[in-house]
Amino acid sequence: MYTIKSMATKIGLQNQELTSGNPWWRNPEWHKTDKDLNAATESGIDYKSGVLNDLATGNLYILRGPRRVGKTVAIKQTIKALLEAGVPQHCIIRVSADGWTAKDLKNLVLHTTLPPIPKDSTRYWFIDEASAISGQWDSELKALRDNDPQFAADTVVITGSNSAALTEAMGVLAGRRGPGVDIDRTMLPMGFASFVSILAQTPLPPRPSIAPGELRSPRALQAFVDLIPWLDELVKLWETYLQYGGFPSSVACAKAGQPISSSFIKTIFDVIQKDAFKNSRLDVATSTAFQERLWQGMASPVNLTSIGSDVGIVKETAVRHLQYLRDAFLLWDCPKRQSGNWLPNPLAQDKIYAIDPIIARLPNLRNAQRKDIDPTVLSEMQVGMALRRRLISDLPDASWDDFIFYFTSTTRKEIDFVSHHLNGAAIEGKYIQDGGWKGEAATVDASPWDGLMVTRNIL
């Protein structure tokens, strides 16, 4: 009696994965049964970020952002749109590269069996979570763009959730990314305007696009005046936004009138503890205490020596874990502005902000005994994030340099956000309408800029 063993080569298995992962090759109705697109539809929020709109043929795009923000859904929405626009189905290839090696990436392009495409056509390659590939994957991409004429002419989109890996890849791939000018894209949790469009009970008037440099313009004032009749609803939605944030799964819970689901809280915990902190040697309790202490101090310049002392770790360990969060796109730095120019002051401590309320609130969401974040701090954080989100959208290269700062006056009073992109304006947050606000106004008045007081209500 003979036993027949199933044998499969690595490339053969890769071919199988390609056919199962690219169902549009054989089924034009693929999107009706796609689990990611169906989950997005069933969530009830119908959110399309548009982050991959207007892909130009022949470019190599890098889409960066935190895990669970919706990059995979954005890719599949883009694939559906390309097919509807008439791109032949065999010209589109998507792979999930999480757990791959650099050799797997090379084999994908050179050695797998792909369906033939029409003459003079090029392909679209969507390589999801490329930054999780082990080895010199960026060097393999460079070699493929240099030595394979077909791949060099193709449109490539790589996504990733590791800032350090993607920054290094940008350097390695310089000169091999095509002629496009908008080839670096960033996907962040949705902003307040998108949140309002999903949750508002009554339709709001059309919103003009106000650039950061126009915040004190007549157009901005008119937009403000036009929204006054909806003030009560906008205040409630801002409060909700500060609690739920902009990750699509969390927004879906807000839309349904439910607390943030325990499953999504666990997912975000895993994003931090098992992915961002995968090289950490801290136990869960200590790393959670570090996060709690870090986020509680968001409104003030960060002192890592003090934070480390408070949670029982040395400063070097605190620095390392801060970098883990930075590399995972889970926080951003707001440095102090140098006197006389738009550069960070290297001798001053930065302020650190989480990218979303669920990141900052996670220690409390997992354990109610840990402190929640004060709404005034969450509001300041989200105002800064709104400014950052818009500037990254308008100026794609800006996310790789410092362009938003805090400012300290000669009387040691702080202004929350200043930037040369604000066209002479300075932003100071004020969460509630009661109490004194003239002190904040006086701080801005004493600065070189015109003030803009940002509140949840009307003073």
Region locations from a protein language model:
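Accessory nucleic acid-recognition modules appended to NTPase machines
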Residues: 2, 9, 251-415, 419-421
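Short glycine-rich substrate-engagement loop in P-loop NTPases that contacts/grips substrate
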Residues: 90-121
